[in-house]
Design a protein with these regions (language model features):
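Double-stranded beta-helix
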Residues: 1-3, 74-108
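A short glycine-rich, His/Asp/Glu-containing loop-to-beta-strand
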Residues: 1-38, 93
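A structural signal for the main folded, soluble domain(s) of proteins
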Residues: 10-11, 47, 74
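A generic "binding-loop/recognition-motif" signal
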Residues: 25-27, 36-37, 55, 71-72, ...
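Short beta-strand segments
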Residues: 29, 55-57, 98
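Short hydrophobic/aromatic-rich beta-strand segments that constitute the beta-sheet cores
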Residues: 30, 50-52, 75
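Glycine- and acidic-residue-biased ligand/ion/polar-headgroup-sensing regions
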Residues: 35-54
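Short acidic-glycine-tyrosine-enriched beta hairpin
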Residues: 53-72
């Protein structure tokens, strides 16, 4: 569990990992980037507010986006319903410690 919700790893191989992220209502992940992996996000339930670089946009069910490695990004749930996102990570290192937090409301 995380302060913003939960994640479940569905499949993990050497060069990719597939997760389901559940972001609780009105919560957000840290503004962050990863050195070794890129991510694809597909919204399967709810509405996502996405920041990638200096751009911010909304994704609805069945919409997706790509987050390149080393690009700052944040996933938020602006609604009162849970947000579920399928995250596909790819890269040469997929450890949970490959994260640089630039801003974090939970002070991690």
């Amino acid at each position: 569990d995380r302060p913003w919700g939960t994640f479940e790893v569905l499949r993990e191989q050497n060069n990719y990992k597939v997760k389901v992220l559940t972001v609780n209502p009105t919560e957000k992940l840290s503004l962050q980037y990863h050195r070794h992996r890129s991510e694809h996000w597909v919204v399967v339930e709810g509405t996502a507010l996405v920041q990638i670089g200096d751009k911010e946009f909304t994704l609805n069910v069945n919409e997706s986006t790509y987050v390149p490695a080393k690009q700052k990004h944040r996933l938020s749930n602006p609604s009162l319903e849970p947000l579920k996102v399928i995250e596909v990570q790819s890269g040469d290192y997929l450890g949970e410690d490959d994260i640089v937090r630039l801003e974090d409301v939970y002070r991690r």
